[in-house]
Curated annotation (Swiss-Prot):
The keyword Glycoprotein applies. It comes from Solanum lycopersicum (Tomato). It is an enzyme of class 3 (hydrolase). This is Purple acid phosphatase isozyme LeSAP1. The lineage of its organism: Eukaryota, Viridiplantae, Streptophyta, Embryophyta, Tracheophyta. The keyword Secreted applies. Its EC number is 3.1.3.2. Coiled coil: none annotated.
Length: 9
């Protein structure tokens, strides 16, 4: 996949 997933909690 070429997705960028950036999760900041």
């Amino acid at each position: 996949a070429g997705d960028v997933i950036y999760i900041v909690r």
